[in-house]
Design a protein with these regions (language model features):
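Alpha-helical transmembrane segments and their immediate juxtamembrane cytosolic regions
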Residues: 1-334
């Protein structure tokens, strides 16, 4: 049996920081059917930011071989990390929507709440679907850890295509698995086969490489614009997802290499889970108070949601949540 030594990847933490910034941006602004700058930015980050989290998780998991007892321990550990916050924050959000339902963006349907929560559908806190989906994919990866990640990536991608064309499942456990498992396992495959090549690439780590990635990024934004406003092709959508995740990864490696803004991205990466879990409530509070009750202009409270949704969770977590074992367990799964 093989055992993997736990490694810490600064590049992946930086990538997590960039991805969580995209989450906060995506939750701050409204999408638009016709092109606007803020509307495009919101739709743009949605092209790749959640797939990036699955990629990151798969990368960090890598390829591990476990005994039966180790599989059980790993599943219990993942349940504590993901499902404890999932159920706790579901209850918290349901109670808040019960008390302040008149201000809720998405009113709660209590008649189907239990079933919805158990199958990962229509959670009161929309962002919690990620925890549920990741847990299911984690279990699958743990149970089938004897199969290499490249093979699993290919197999899951075939299932993804079949689901997109034939099964068309989405919005609950089966749809989540079929939609994102291939990206998760792709992260493990990239770690094994590509990571060192990118990190040690003289071209990509040179000034010329930075210029190349900048030019490619501009072209990517143009492609994403077409995907958002012009075409509903699943092939284009898939290409935009893969390119976006890979670009984010390469940019993170370049940032780590040149230490450009590294401390900021590392800070956001270190508090990535905290921002994802707590930021929702900060942003919703601003939306209700400033948007619904006080009637602030959309741009005013939207920017407040972005700024405070990013900063407030760091302070709340550092000085309150992480200092309390129970809160840390219930909210962060630590």
């Amino acid at each position: 049996m093989e055992k993997s030594k736990k490694q810490y990847f600064n590049e992946i933490n930086i990538m997590r920081g960039m991805a969580v910034l995209c989450v906060v941006i995506g939750h701050s602004f409204n999408p638009t059917k016709t092109p606007t700058i803020l509307g495009f930015i919101k739709s743009f980050v949605y092209c790749f930011h959640m797939p990036a989290f699955f990629f990151i998780s798969g990368f960090l998991e890598g390829e591990k071989r476990r005994s039966i007892s180790e599989k059980k321990q790993a599943i219990v550990k993942k349940a504590k990390r993901l499902m404890v916050p999932y159920f706790f924050l579901t209850v918290v959000t349901a109670v808040l929507k019960l008390l302040f339902g008149a201000f809720a963006r998405n009113p709660l349907n209590y008649s189907t709440l239990a079933v919805d929560v158990l199958i990962g559908r229509n959670n009161p806190n929309g962002g919690l679907w990620f925890l549920y989906a990741l847990f299911i994919i984690f279990i699958f990866g743990i149970l089938f850890d004897t199969i290499n990640r490249t093979t699993l990536t290919g197999t899951m991608f075939v299932l993804y295509m079949l689901n997109t064309i034939v099964f068309k499942q989405s919005g609950y456990v089966v749809g989540f698995f079929l939609s994102y498992a291939w990206i998760y396992f792709m992260g493990g495959a990239v770690r094994k086969h590509i990571y060192e090549k990118i990190k040690n690439s003289e071209l990509l780590m040179s000034v010329k490489g930075i210029v190349i990635i900048a030019v490619v990024s501009v072209g990517y934004m143009m492609l994403a614009f077409v995907r958002i406003y012009k075409s509903q092709s699943w092939i284009l959508a898939t290409a935009v997802t893969v390119i976006g995740v890979f670009l984010l990864f390469v940019i993170a490696v370049q940032i780590e290499h040149y230490h450009c803004g590294e401390k900021l991205w590392m800070l956001l990466g270190d508090y990535g889970m905290d921002i994802y879990m707590i930021g929702y409530y900060v942003q919703q509070a601003i939306f209700v108070v400033c948007g619904k009750i006080l009637g602030f202009d959309y741009l005013v409270y939207a920017w407040m949601m972005l700024i405070f949704g990013l900063i407030a969770p760091i302070f709340l977590s550092k000085y309150v949540v992480r200092k309390n074992h129970m809160l840390s367990t219930l909210i962060l799964g630590r």
